[in-house]
């Protein structure tokens, strides 16, 4: 009987702890993560977001230094507007860079990223598809999306990431090769770019972010997802451990 009571008390403690953990770290009242996520997985999401915040700071510093035009998009932009930072379950950073600035950005990232970070594209990674709409990524070398794979289940380096897309200007219209469904944005919707809070620093967003989000998601972007969808679409993450296959496929990144 004592054992049953003890187990029951332990269960109650776990439930209370998980609820408190769910409702911390967020600006959204009465928020809870998906029941699919364990306490450890929630902790890893938060640690991963903290690391990617540092990565985004480095990226932003380089862009500001070299006058490179960029702005956050997709879930990262929703996070800015609704949370002034991360959507609590988001698993990466999404952004656009002006096509005229991309070559300059590539060279700056190759030279100026700190130890532990790496610029990945088809030129630096033989496993990266040349025709990928995501033209490049900034990767953390000491972390892993445990369940994520490339096209057809192929493995490539999958440390925590900033996804880099490019946008183009054509006769006053803004084109997004990575999302051709967005056709109604003009230069006035993008410029002037705005500096806004993201966690403990500032990032760049477009001038009319709500028009972009309404076009991409409809009006539903402003409402919180159903509870069962509040988990990273990238799957499980480990903020502090490199995937084992990284050492085998990318010895040049780890043997110096």
State the predicted function of each range.
Residues 3-69, 74, 78-89, 97-256:
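The feature captures the alpha-helical scaffold/lid subdomain characteristic of nucleotidyltransferase
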